[in-house]
Design a protein with these regions (language model features):
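Acidic (Asp/Glu)-rich catalytic clusters
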Residues: 1-5, 34-42, 75-79, 118-123, ...
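Glycine-rich, proline-tolerant flexible connector loops at the mouths of alpha/beta enzymes
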Residues: 15-18, 49-62, 90-96, 137
């Protein structure tokens, strides 16, 4: 069946003294909102923290602030009987290398799990929704799916505890094909090394881009758009199995 959930953060706001970075808002009144959502039948919640990469950022302050917010959200969600989906997203915007993404993703996840522990979050009762370790979108030498899988699994083995039951990847602006191929490679490698977590997906654009383009708001395109969506969903589901 389908379990309903809700995104509860209020988006990114400029980080004080570092206005090119964002910190996620929405903690004020969250405890009361979560009780209302649970009463309405919600089963899970989601909170996204955004980490950008340039030569000079992310700062430790940005990583720490977003990790703290994610942990507060997760603790409050579990207190309300909801499963938190913890989403620290290292953006793929930029020209950075896959090695730079590895470094920033490792730093970010290390702080996230430190903060989750500080807030007594039960890792067995939450899901992690991270980025894959990728080259920057504007890098002319994009890493292959196999390299993405190797770097992603290597990074997570360092910092994601085995107690986390599942990792559900965000697509993060990858093309439909790229998101599918990378997920497939990650699951193949995960199976090979007997990774301790389920490796699945939580895609928005990675499932919808081609569908929305075909539909374009026109009723005569609905059937074709549905066919495209079904095809992409089948491919992504197969990729989740490796």
């Amino acid at each position: 069946g389908i379990m309903p959930g809700i995104k509860v953060d209020k988006g990114g706001q400029p980080l004080p003294n570092s206005p090119t970075e964002l910190v996620t808002g929405g903690l004020d009144g969250l405890k009361e909102r979560l009780k209302d959502y649970a009463d309405l039948g919600a089963c899970f919640t989601k909170w996204r923290g955004v980490i950008a990469i340039t030569e000079s950022i992310p700062t430790n302050n940005c990583i720490n602030a977003n990790a703290h917010g994610l942990a507060r959200f997760a603790a409050l969600s579990q207190e309300a009987g909801l499963v938190p989906i913890v989403e620290p997203e290292v953006l793929m915007d930029g020209t950075h290398t896959i090695e730079r993404c590895f470094e920033v993703t490792e730093r970010t996840l290390r702080e996230v799990f430190y903060q989750l522990a500080q807030h007594n979050v039960a890792l067995e009762g939450c899901l992690l929704k991270p980025n894959m370790v990728l080259s920057g979108a504007s890098n002319t030498k994009r890493a292959s799916a196999e390299e993405v899988a190797e770097k992603t699994i290597a990074c997570f083995k360092r910092v994601v505890p085995a107690a986390v039951p599942g990792i559900v990847f965000l697509s993060g602006g990858q093309s439909d094909d790229e998101a599918t191929l990378n997920l497939d490679a990650i699951n193949k490698l995960g199976t090979k090394i007997d990774a301790p977590w389920e490796l699945s997906f939580s895609y928005g654009r990675g499932l919808q881009q081609a569908t929305l383009k075909q539909w374009s708001g026109k009723s005569e395109n609905v059937t074709d758009a549905q066919t495209i969506f079904y095809h992409r969903a089948k491919l992504t589901s197969a990729a989740r199995q490796g």
